[in-house]
From Swiss-Prot:
Residue positions binding Mg(2+): 173, 193
Protein name as annotated: GTPase Obg
Ligand binding (GTP): 166-173, 191-195, 213-216, 283-286, 314-316
GO molecular function terms listed in the Swiss-Prot or TrEMBL record: GTP binding; GTPase activity; magnesium ion binding
A single GO BP: ribosome biogenesis
SUPFAM superfamilies, per the entry: Obg GTP-binding protein N-terminal domain (SSF82051), P-loop containing nucleoside triphosphate hydrolases (SSF52540)
Known function: An essential GTPase which binds GTP, GDP and possibly (p)ppGpp with moderate affinity, with high nucleotide exchange rates and a fairly low GTP hydrolysis rate. Plays a role in control of the cell cycle, stress response, ribosome biogenesis and in those bacteria that undergo differentiation, in morphogenesis control.
Compartment annotation: Cytoplasm
Positions of the UniProt region annotated as Disordered: 127-147
Class in the EC hierarchy, top level: hydrolase
């Protein structure tokens, strides 16, 4: 299936149903009074994370989602039926952004997580709500309010513990094939990897971590060159980045300059991403003698001003890979994910029906009713409107 990590959709919640103007009419009951019911609330639009999905391709074709409108109220104090909700299922890791305001509405990071993206309109009030000791035959009602309407941008961001960085042909895909069951394409030409891929590294029966491989970066990626800048967002949730450096590039390029390009492009894209823990990993050491590889790796690290530990591995032969994976596993265990307070979903605000009803009644009371009479006749405009509605 084609990997699609962005999609734009339109969500429209249902409008609230209108209230009803009606009076009780029964034999031997000359003054039945008002019995118009309230309308129904409009349906909501929800997002739900589903671990069985891994792409947003469905929303390249289906772009509009509308919830059901609430039914109007009816006589005999019958309340209109509430509109049906609409649930949109998205892959785990999807970020929901309101394109109108640029606001991030939420991150869908857990299976089954739900997010309200469009609230249905509130119901209108029937004329029963407006009866009082001085107005026994009210002919007022209120209409339902419109539902929310939003244009949303869905961004799929892979959930991984470890992210792979490097130039094209640095050996990232070979590494992920060596440590996991993932089988990304491997070949001797640049940009073999065209879309991100995930692999689960199992150290034992209880310990494992997820590693993400993205297309290689090249100089000018932040300005749109190559493929990598488009997929750098998939590394934002990673806890540690493995910066793979080809210790002896076959094209004769300078490994130091290649590493500096990666660092520069990271900083241009996001300072937060550039500040993440980054480990230096020299790959393809099997192409050199052990002493030569160690000497060259030391020289590159010094040229980069690297003072932390670095690793020498061969993803193709497996040399040094196991030790690197265990160190990564230890780092992940010692640095658990800290739940960001801002990332928590906002609490659902309950609508205060009493306040809503009081506001509607106050608005009606403010209207001019000097020519009001309690006797209904055919000349009343409200009565004519009511007859046509029935």
């Amino acid at each position: 299936m084609k990997f699609v990590d962005e999609a734009s959709i339109l969500v429209v919640a249902g409008d609230g149903g209108n209230g009803c103007v009606s009076f009780r009419r029964e034999k031997y009951i000359p003054k039945g009074g008002p019995d118009g019911g309230d309308g129904g609330d409009g349906g909501d639009v929800w997002m739900e994370a589903d671990e069985n999905l891994n792409t947003l391709i469905d929303y390249r074709f289906e772009k509009s989602f509308r919830a059901e409108r609430g039914q109007n109220g009816a006589s005999r104090d019958c309340t209109g039926k509430r509109g049906k909700d609409v649930t949109i299922k998205v892959p785990v890791g999807t970020r929901v952004i309101d394109q109108g305001t640029g606001e991030t509405m939420g991150d869908m990071t857990k299976h089954g997580q739900r997010l309200l993206v469009a609230k249905g309109g509130w119901h209108g009030l029937g004329n029963t709500r407006f009866k009082s000791s001085v107005n026994r035959t009210p002919r007022q009602k209120t209409n339902g309010t419109p539902g929310d309407k939003r244009e949303l941008l869905l961004e799929l961001m892979l959930l991984a513990d470890v992210g792979m960085l490097g130039m094209p042909n640095a050996g990232k895909s070979t590494f992920i094939r060596a440590v996991s069951a993932a089988k990304p394409k491997v070949a001797d030409y640049p940009f073999t990897t065209l879309v991100p891929s995930l692999g689960v590294v199992r150290m034992d029966n209880e310990k494992s971590f997820v590693v993400a491989d993205i297309p290689g970066l090249i100089e000018g990626a932040a300005e749109g060159a190559g493929l990598g800048i488009r997929f750098l967002k998939h590394l934002e949730r990673c806890r540690v980045l493995l910066h793979l450096i080809d210790i002896d590039p076959i094209d004769g390029t300078d490994p130091v300059e290649n590493a500096r390009i990666i660092i520069s492009e990271l900083e241009k894209y996001s300072q937060d991403l550039a500040a993440k823990p980054r480990w230096l990993v020299f790959n393809k050491i099997d192409l050199l003698d052990k002493a030569e590889a160690e000497e060259k790796a030391k020289a590159i690290a010094e040229a980069l001003g690297w003072e932390d530990k670095y690793y020498l591995i061969s993803a193709a032969s497996g040399l040094g890979v196991k030790d690197l994976c265990w160190d990564v596993m230890t780092f992940i265990i010692e640095n658990p994910v800290v739940q960001d307070e801002e990332a928590k979903q906002p609490e659902k605000v309950e609508f205060m029906w009493d306040d809503y009803h009081r506001q509607q009644l106050e608005e009606i009371a403010e209207e001019d009713d000097e020519d009001w009479d309690d006797d209904w006749d055919e000349d009343d405009e409200e009565g004519v409107e009511f007859i046509y509605k029935r």
